[in-house]
């Protein structure tokens, strides 16, 4: 069975075509295309501008994806699109595109939860059995485990997502958004050597990132080279703190928080596996820290590369086809989108 997936919940529009050869067989990725809306340094991406970008690219990406996949329209079983969560205007653009090609091609539609798409793609690529899932992206931060045909949320952010924290700090430092701010922060962090104290916001199984961001933004004012030397930000030893040091300190602090709550979830559910998904999951330092924790417990960590960690259409096609095979079809009048669509709202009928 073959499905096409349309993803556009944030600043990336992705189209993917996938084939499921049969039960218990590895899915075949036929095409996986993506284009990113990039805003100037110091700026985020506005929903209206992002939606305009998606509408400008969606038709050509659909054509290219189908052509690259080497399939005919009649071979496609269903059209899968991101129903939510995400930003309203970009989601509407993708939903409109899905409805349009459904009517043109005469194919059924399946609305997919963005978070479940990340999880199922991660499981398919890494072959992780029944892991605790750390889902970290620009809009979401959740610690998840599967139970009784639901992906249960054991911990999450109490305010902003970890990716949003990183992106906003990148704007403070005027770090470029190309290819994406989190990657550029990561590269600067690799050059940092001084660990600056930042608030540590773990509340039981949940985490808070807004206070850390506010503290980092305040410290960043001390990096201004036009300030008198005595007012510049320094370490306790009197060494000047650099933007690389602040990026390093931010990463070390927020990733340590994620490791703590993930380890607690592993102990609770008795799992020896961690699957890291979402755009922030492509960060090498996060994977390294999570791997150290997992190995100390005799376990292992699983993650994918940026083709599948970062938002993409193939994960929507994969999760949508799994739902479709259980009899799920979204009626045309229900092909709406919602900015708030929790992971645990989805009935996972394709798992035992």
UniProtKB/Swiss-Prot annotation:
Record keyword Metal-binding present: yes
Cofactor binding comment, as recorded: Binds 1 divalent metal cation per subunit.
Its domain of life?
Eukaryota
Database matches in Pfam families: TsaD (PF00814)
Residues the entry annotates as binding a divalent metal cation: 114, 118, 135, 311
Just give the chief location class: cytoplasm
Q: What is its EC number?
A: 2.3.1.234
Which residues does the record give as substrate binding sites? 135-139, 167, 182, 186, 283
One GO biological process this protein is involved in is: positive regulation of transcription by RNA polymerase II
Q: Which Gene3D superfamilies match?
A: 3.30.420.40
Question: Is this entry keyworded Secreted?
Answer: no
Any one annotated GO CC term: chromatin
Intracellular or extracellular location(s): Cytoplasm; Nucleus
Chain's role: Component of the EKC/KEOPS complex that is required for the formation of a threonylcarbamoyl group on adenosine at position 37 (t(6)A37) in tRNAs that read codons beginning with adenine. The complex is probably involved in the transfer of the threonylcarbamoyl moiety of threonylcarbamoyl-AMP (TC-AMP) to the N6 group of A37. KAE1 likely plays a direct catalytic role in this reaction, but requires other protein(s) of the complex to fulfill this activity. The EKC/KEOPS complex also promotes both telomere uncapping and telomere elongation.
**Protein family according to the UniProt entry:** Belongs to the KAE1 / TsaD family.
* HAMAP family to which the protein is assigned, alphabetical: Kae1 (MF_01446)
Q: How does it assemble?
A: Component of the EKC/KEOPS complex composed of at least BUD32, CGI121, GON7, KAE1 and PCC1; the whole complex dimerizes.
Q: What is this protein called?
A: tRNA N6-adenosine threonylcarbamoyltransferase
Q: Which organism is it from?
A: Phaeosphaeria nodorum (strain SN15 / ATCC MYA-4574 / FGSC 10173) (Glume blotch fungus)
Q: Which gene encodes it?
A: KAE1
